[in-house]
Amino acid sequence: RQRFEHFHAGENAVAVEAVRAAAVDPAAPWVFVAGPVGSGRTHLLIAACQAAIDAGRTAQYLPLAGLRGSRAAAIRGMAGSDVLAIDDVDSIAGEADAEHALFDTFNRYRADGCSLLFASVAAPVSLEIALPDLRSRLGSLTQALLKPLADVERRQVLRDHAAGRGIELDDTVLDWLFAH
């Protein structure tokens, strides 16, 4: 399961804490998580939703890149939760309807005192968001920039996942995996 205790933070401990705080504390600043593919953005957003639920809040997760049909309608349909985690913000860049829907959702959640979390492959300043007000609002959030794990940490992640399934990975196997 994608929970905070299963996330190997490495150099990202401050970012993880910012996301956790935003999930469980309505007064905490909202967070925009940015990092390359495989850095754990999605894991953190799903973990945040689970932490919010564990804290007695309601939460929803919306992966924009995987949506078929109108992303604007999907964004507008996300309402009524204490925490909304929106993944793949970069995927709506240049989609006027989706950008406006996200802008409206941002304002609605702020007015309702709810929490929003966002994730993307790049920080808001680097996204090609056409709507200036949305770009500005996203840029005003706490920025959690994820760094990829070092190889030694990635090896430990693989060992831990395998151990959870009763498999022991030795260095020879890991050397082969990393080479291929």
Model-derived segments and spans:
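Dynamic helix-loop-helix/coil hinge segments at AAA+ ATPase domain boundaries and subdomain interfaces
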Residues: 1-16
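Walker A/P-loop nucleotide-binding motif
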Residues: 27-45
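AAA+/P-loop NTPase substrate/partner-engagement loops
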Residues: 54-82
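Conserved nucleotide-sensing/catalytic segment adjacent to the nucleotide-binding pocket
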Residues: 74-119
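Short regulatory helix/loop adjacent to the ATP-binding pocket of P-loop NTPases
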Residues: 124-139
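Conserved AAA+ ATPase "sensor/coupling" helix adjacent to the nucleotide-binding pocket
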Residues: 141, 155-168
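Conserved AAA+ ATPase "SRH/arginine-finger" region at the nucleotide-binding site
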Residues: 141-153
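Short conserved motifs of the RecA-like P-loop NTPase core
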Residues: 168-180
